């Protein structure tokens, strides 16, 4: 099964992230959200908090498709 990392940086556009994640998951692609910050909690452009699966630092050595 394919696997993809979706990177979430502070100020990300939530609709772009959520729609992308939704489409990939509907296609049976494993998706892991990664925060490009010290914490898994990331705040979007519209101040909506989202908690990523992991941080980029925690998964830096993992390979994705």
What is each residue range found by the language model?
Residues 1-65:
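Extended, subdomain-level signal for the structured scaffold at the beginning of enzyme domains
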